Regions:
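Short beta-strand-to-loop acidic/aromatic patch adjacent to the donor-nucleotide binding site
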Residues: 228-239
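Glycine-rich, basic loop-to-helix element that forms the pyrophosphate-binding segment
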Residues: 161, 205-225
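A short, conserved alpha-helix in the catalytic core of glycosyltransferases
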Residues: 312-316, 322-349
Length: 439
């Protein structure tokens, strides 16, 4: 075993040397989505570091077929928009996210909240922020209103049959009945008091924890069923940095004819720092001030404020539920790249998110990175799903680089043979499409 590991270490060293000698043609990004909640009940992959696949091009090359017509699949700035937020047991954070989504100068037409915890407190919050009533309360009110109307009808009939009505009194009775009729219709009248520009809420509780992948898949399909022309992805622990984010994304999408556009994802506690390192050219950037220009084509941070055309989903589909958490964002990015659709990141707006850069460990003086999450639960999904991703079209040729980087990180930098063995086992599970979840 030691001899095999020594040979693998030597192979990693030589492969690393070849890679670093051709940095201009190979993208070394290794980022996948994450969660901050450890344990088997983790909500979704975007409740913490969601590290996007930060560059297109050589990382996941587009398929050789003719690129789709940009105009056909581009985001319609005048179309209906549904915001989709996936949450799990984080009511306080969700409240801040909902506040900023509802304050947008260009408000979404719907806000769909997928609740992986089916928590009544979340349902109450959604309707408190966006209007309407929780379904259980609304159903009870409707039943009570119907029963009250029935009692009124029966009472009126009994009164009419048992009393002698003097001449001319019928007109007065009818006059008295008029307010009663309008009172019975008051619930619908009250609903008209809600400002028409306020987003319409849709609360989707799930008694099965769908993870981030399944949560966004459900939310996307619900948005399509409503007739949304575009879907705006939001998160419960992140939020738009200001009230102009959605309007800015629409402007950029129209100008660039984009099927998908993302804001810059910044550190929620330090707006000048990126929440995740981003590679521009051959250099890894960690600060907003280090970025050049106002638009980065072919770069996307999905599920963190990204706006996606509904027509584009005819081609790229919805996130893969099997991945549950971590890697679903990278896999979705892979599909966008291979589709040939136009996409990119606007540097003129931001989505604030907790810092996720700590689990990306630099190697070779920062020229490359590997991912090492805290906790076995996070590592299980990160490395297993990464193995699956590396077996998919557009990413297979990066497999030697993947082995080299992680062998270097575990065997040379950390001197952690057990850690490398764990990585290798989980990576193999992913390549074999073994999607069982740990107990």
């Amino acid at each position: 075993m030691k001899r095999a590991l020594r040979g693998l270490k030597n192979a990693a060293t030589s492969t690393i040397a070849r890679i670093t000698g051709s940095q201009g043609t190979i993208n070394t990004t290794d980022q996948s989505s994450d969660t901050t909640t450890a344990g088997p009940h983790t909500a979704h992959s975007h409740a913490g570091p969601h590290a996007p696949n930060t560059t297109a091009g050589p990382h996941t090359p587009a398929a050789t077929h003719t690129a789709p017509n940009p105009g056909r699949y581009a985001i319609d700035p005048r179309g209906a928009i549904a915001a989709v937020i996936v949450t799990h047991n984080r009511v306080d954070l969700l409240e801040r996210s909902l506040d900023m989504v509802a304050k947008q100068t260009r408000r979404p037409d719907w806000v769909i909240v997928v609740d992986n915890g089916a928590d009544p407190e979340v349902e109450t919050l959604v309707h408190a922020k966006l209007g309407g009533e929780p379904q259980s309360r609304r159903a009870s009110a409707e039943i009570a209103a119907r029963r009250f109307a029935e009692i009124q009808t029966v009472g009126a009939a009994i009164t009419k049959a048992s009393e002698e009505v003097p001449d001319g009194a019928a007109a007065n009775d009818n006059a008295d009945a008029t307010p009663s009729t309008s009172a019975s219709s008051s619930p619908s009248a009250a609903s008209g008091d809600v400002p028409q520009r306020r987003p319409r809420p849709m609360y989707l509780p799930s008694r099965t924890n769908l993870g981030g992948a399944g949560g966004f898949a459900l939310g996307f399909l619900a948005a399509l069923a409503l007739g949304a022309d575009s879907i705006w992805c939001a998160d419960d622990d992140g939020r738009p940095a200001d009230e102009n984010v959605l309007a800015t994304l629409l402007d950029v999408a129209e100008r660039e004819q984009l099927a998908q556009v993302s804001p810059l994802v910044t550190n929620i506690n330090n707006p000048d720092r990126l929440a995740f390192p981003l590679r521009q050219g051959l250099t890894w950037r960690r600060r907003v001030s280090e970025l050049e220009g106002d638009f980065l084509p072919g770069i996307a941070s999905l599920f963190n404020g990204a706006l996606i055309s509904a027509r584009a989903m005819e081609i790229i589909g919805v996130p893969d539920y099997r991945l549950f958490i971590r890697g679903d964002e990278v896999e979705y990015h892979r599909r966008i790249v291979r589709s040939g659709l136009r996409f990119g990141t606007s540097l003129t707006c931001a989505y604030a998110h907790p810092d996720g850069s700590e689990e990306f460990k630099p190697i070779l003086g920062g020229r490359m990175h590997t991912q090492y999450p805290d906790g076995e639960f996070k590592r299980y999904f990160t490395y297993r799903n990464r193995g699956y991703l590396m077996s998919q079209p557009g990413m297979r040729r990066l497999l030697p680089q993947e082995y080299a980087r992680f062998a270097w990180f575990f065997l040379v930098q950390r001197k952690d043979v057990a850690g490398f063995r764990e990585w290798l086992q989980l990576h193999t599970l992913g390549r074999q499409e073994r999607f069982e979840r740990p107990e």
